[in-house]
Amino acid sequence: TCNRVELLAMGKGDLAGQMLNSWAGVRNAKVEDLERYVYTYKNEEAVRHLFRVASSLDSMILGEPQILGQLKAAYRKASACHATGVILNHLLHKAFSVAKRVRTETAVASSAVSISFAAVELAKRIFGTMQGHKAMLIGAGEMAERRR
């Protein structure tokens, strides 16, 4: 997602430790430095977390629509590389179904906005108008492009 990295895996042994070691290697960082930023979920807790993320219940802006799209894009890439397997395929499809149900059966998406939209609204509250003021967008992602 925009403000974090989520890694999903299924298997035996200490997968969390193996993934953290791999991530540290990729980032050229020490495992100890990364550990304080890592949350690990297993079994039912992991499934619950995935469903909350997919449904945008675990995001900076409740109901943010971009997260589900990011998850689907990541799933498509992983699936194309044959990196998901039967159980993760089923789990992710279920997560997509749960997310759709949450969006259609609750009001979670009724006031959903993006982080960039929230930032612009806050700036308007502070300055009254953006006319005559300059702003700098840090980052070059899709959200920055949409707010020009």
Roles of regions detected by a PLM:
Residues 33-131:
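Glycine/serine-rich phosphate-binding loop and adjoining beta1-alpha1 elements at the start
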Residues 120-148:
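Glycine-rich phosphate/diphosphate-binding loop of Rossmann-like nucleotide-binding domains
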